Every structure is written in structure tokens, then in C-alpha cells.
């Protein structure tokens, strides 16, 4: 088996009133938040799917199904810590992560360092092992119409 494995992940959630907006474990000031069974942190969800995909372990819905009441309102960083442990238990470590968050509003650049630091702490990585970029969809599609926010992630795993 190869010493390296890669995986990619994607997530999207609808923006709604009355919910907090949490990205990368950081709560952002915004009039709308992401709707979902857990805290709906699309960045953290995309990262979890990339990590699980790298080892052909399925997706986050398999481990944390939205039909299970125990995950209602769950903190995605706690779920991420469980995924990280699952990977470590199988003899792998994270080489690096890279991600893109697509949102028209709010502007994310001022929050990227805090997101990276929060994720690095949970994953026991150095912040420079985590890339987070933000872009818009130039007013195109559901994210462009500000109906939701999505995130893409890729993970490189290295055999211990």
C-alpha cells in the first residue's frame, strides 16, 4: 500500500435566520446562519469528508447521521476530533489540508487565521499545514445568490 493517500470533501448548507454562522469552528457576525442537524460548519464538514475519503472510510453521514438525535446541534470540532482519532488509530497522520470556502457574505479574509488556528489545535497540527482560502461565486448559483455557503477540501495523509 502507498505511504500517501489523498481525499477530497465538499459540503453546502442553506443560509437561514435564527442560526449562528460557524465556519472552521469560529462564530462569525452575520444576520444569517447555516441550517443543519449539527452546527452546519461547512468548512469542518468538508475537511472531515476529505480525511475519511482518503482512507475510503465513507463520509460523515455514516459516522454522524443527521437522523440520530445525539448529533443534533453537535459541535463539528468535536466530530472532527473523532475523525482525527479514527485516522490515527489506523496508523495515518495528516500531512496537510487545503480548502476553499465559497460565500458572498460575510467577507471571510479577516477570520481565516483564527479558523486555521482553531482547526490546527483540534487536529494537533501546525497552522501552516492547513490552507484556507475564501472566494465568491460572482453572484452565480445558490452561493452567489446568498442562499447558502459551501466549502471544498483536500487532505494528504501520510502513513506513520
From Swiss-Prot:
Cofactor dependency: a divalent metal cation
Reaction(s) the record says it catalyses: 4-CDP-2-C-methyl-D-erythritol 2-phosphate = 2-C-methyl-D-erythritol 2,4-cyclic diphosphate + CMP
InterPro entries xrefs: MECDP_synthase, MECDP_synthase_CS, MECDP_synthase_sf
Listed EC numbers: 4.6.1.12
Feature type site, description Transition state stabilizer: 37, 136
Cofactor note: Binds 1 divalent metal cation per subunit.
SUPFAM superfamilies in the cross-refs: IpsF-like
Class of the enzyme per the UniProt entry, highest EC level: lyase
Statement: the UniProt record of this protein carries the keyword Metal-binding: yes
Keyword terms of this UniProt record: Isoprene biosynthesis, Lyase, Metal-binding
Protein name, UniProt field: 2-C-methyl-D-erythritol 2,4-cyclodiphosphate synthase
Gene assigned in the entry: ispF
Amino acid at each position: 500500500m502507498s505511504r500517501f493517500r489523498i481525499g477530497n470533501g465538499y459540503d453546502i448548507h442553506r443560509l437561514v435566520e435564527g442560526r449562528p454562522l460557524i465556519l472552521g469552528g469560529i462564530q462569525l457576525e452575520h444576520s444569517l446562519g447555516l441550517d443543519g442537524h449539527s452546527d452546519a460548519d461547512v468548512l469542518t464538514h468538508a475537511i472531515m469528508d476529505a480525511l475519511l475519503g482518503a482512507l475510503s472510510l465513507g463520509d460523515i453521514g455514516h459516522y454522524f447521521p443527521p437522523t440520530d438525535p445525539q448529533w443534533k446541534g453537535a459541535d463539528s470540532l468535536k466530530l472532527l476530533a473523532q475523525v482525527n482519532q479514527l485516522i490515527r488509530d489506523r496508523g495515518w497522520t495528516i500531512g496537510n489540508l487545503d480548502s476553499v470556502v465559497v460565500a458572498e457574505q460575510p467577507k471571510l479574509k479577516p477570520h481565516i487565521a483564527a479558523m486555521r488556528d482553531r482547526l490546527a489545535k483540534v487536529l494537533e497540527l501546525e497552522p501552516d499545514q492547513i490552507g484556507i482560502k475564501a472566494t465568491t461565486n460572482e453572484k452565480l448559483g445558490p452561493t452567489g445568490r446568498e442562499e447558502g455557503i459551501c466549502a471544498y477540501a483536500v487532505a494528504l495523509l501520510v502513513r506513520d
